[in-house]
Curated annotation (Swiss-Prot):
Source organism (scientific name): Drosophila persimilis (Fruit fly)
Gene (UniProt): mael1
Gene3D superfamilies for the chain: High mobility group box domain
Stretches for region Disordered: 374-438
Family named by the database record: Belongs to the maelstrom family.
GO CC terms in record: cytoplasm; nucleus; P granule; perinuclear region of cytoplasm
Protein name, entry field: Protein maelstrom 1
Disulfide-bonded cysteines: none
A GO molecular function held by the record: transcription cis-regulatory region binding
Length: 438
């Protein structure tokens, strides 16, 4: 139903109510009854200003756009603007990554291009706002040819956590990194000094860039809001100018895909079957997730290396090497391209000599099936042969299935995985056609 238009009479009534002390206690209907004889006694010249005011109010009401709200009371227009800005920022980030790779490729320096991988652990997140309290930071500098050339790792003690969120911080720490909460936390307590140290380390290999160029780091899409927020948290206490170079956080998954496409192009290999879903699926498998000796001493001791940021950034570098170095014939160096201690994911068993070993080529040396029937011969099983061919013929071992025969209903296994055991006949007395238990 359309709203009623204003008229000159009601405009006069509202003004009479505002200016006449007698009308303060009257309702609208009573005020209308009082003003009706006054309005009828007024001439057209006296009514003119009120009619003009009502007309102008109607025009303004028609032209004014009413802001739409969502079910939570937020502005729909503002949400659309934020959504469009996020899409635009993501497109600009992807184009920037593609330009970096293309520039390195055209200059024949693709294998020497440095990339910095970063990761943060946090204690808790604010209920309102994108604020994370940092707990641990790690970064590594990586290139295809040199592997992991250097890394930076430190624990952080912010001194306190967000008021009222101690329980959330305890639960998050218990299920992930298991770092003690502030004020008993480990590591640096001066956030400003720590930010300057991190920024200086990230800028070591960027002397040739202009001072206003940002420092680009890479992390996973899930950690991008965490990394951005933790950098802001540290920078808030640092004495830096607004014109200082900033840190930009980019998506490592898109870098992984773009770099793989360029590596195959340089190697002269067809890359038509390579798409973002293929490379992303390989990356998230995280074949080095439980590798020993790549996390900090604390997480190594408490068996939480999976959640250690130092382990994360190194595993990303190893994944890059495992997926791309063989395409450029780059030898894998233990400790730089692959872990120092490598445990292959399969058990070698002898097979018939008729097996064709060149039937398939694994994408990763660490993604092989649990058991591979393979003839030993003189095949190299070193980590550098990550793309060696293996046979499809393998026998999976699944200890969760029941291995007995199921010839009758009595032998069908119960829900717990055990076959029902029938009692021995000696436990019963046979008499009067009934079985009576002792």
């Amino acid at each position: 139903m359309a709203p009623k238009k204003r008229n000159g009479f009601m405009t006069f009534v509202k003004e009479w109510q505002a200016n006449n002390p007698v009308a303060r206690g009257l309702s609208n209907s009573e005020a209308v009854a009082k003003c009706d004889p006054i309005w009828k006694s007024m001439g057209d010249q006296e009514r003119g200003p009120y009619n003009s005011m009502a007309k102008n109010a109607n025009v303004l009401e028609r032209t004014a756009k009413k802001e739409r709200l969502n079910c939570l009371g937020g502005s729909v227009a503002e949400m659309e603007i934020e959504k469009n800005e996020a899409i635009s920022a993501e497109l600009q980030m992807k184009r920037k990554i593609e330009r970096i790779i293309l520039t390195a490729k055209n200059s024949m320096e693709l294998e020497n291009e440095d990339f910095v991988f970063v990761s943060f652990n946090y204690f808790t997140k604010a209920l309102t706002g994108d604020i994370y309290v940092p707990a641990e930071f790690s970064a590594c500098r990586y290139s295809l040819k040199g592997g992991i050339s250097s890394n930076y790792s430190t624990m952080i003690n912010p001194g306190h956590i967000i008021y009222g969120q101690s329980r959330d911080a305890q639960d998050h720490s218990k299920t992930t990194h298991k770092l003690p909460l502030p004020p008993q936390a480990f590591g640096e307590t001066n956030m400003g000094k720590l930010y300057i140290d991190i920024f200086n380390w990230l800028s070591v290999r960027n002397e040739e860039k202009l001072d206003q160029d940002p420092v680009i780091v890479y992390t996973t899409p899930e950690l991008m809001p965490v990394v951005k927020s933790c950098f802001r948290y540290l920078a808030s206490e640092a004495e830096i100018d607004e014109d200082e170079r900033k840190i930009m956080v980019f998506d490592i998954h898109h870098l992984f895909y773009t770099l793989k496409k360029s590596v195959l192009d340089v190697a002269g290999v067809t890359n038509d079957r390579i798409n973002f879903h293929v490379t992303n699926n390989f990356f998230v498998k995280d074949f080095f997730e439980y590798t020993e000796g790549i996390s900090c001493d604390y997480h190594e001791k408490i068996d939480r290396s999976k959640y250690c940021t130092n382990s994360m950034v190194k595993r990303w570098g190893f994944t890059f090497s495992d997926y791309m170095c063989a395409d450029l014939a780059i030898p894998l160096q233990p400790g730089k391209h692959i872990p120092l201690k490598v445990k292959p994911n399969y058990t070698i068993t002898p097979a018939s000599s008729s097996t064709n070993f060149d039937e398939i080529s694994l994408d990763s040396y660490y993604s092989a099936p649990p058991r591979i029937q393979k003839e030993m011969g003189s095949r190299d099983l070193s980590p550098s042969s990550s793309h060696q061919s293996v046979s499809r013929a393998y026998v999976p071992r699944d200890h969760s299935v029941y291995g007995g025969t199921l010839d009758s209903d009595e032998e069908f296994p119960s829900l717990g995985g055990r076959r029902r055991q029938l009692p021995d006949k000696s436990h019963f007395n046979m008499g009067a056609g009934k079985k009576i238990a002792r």
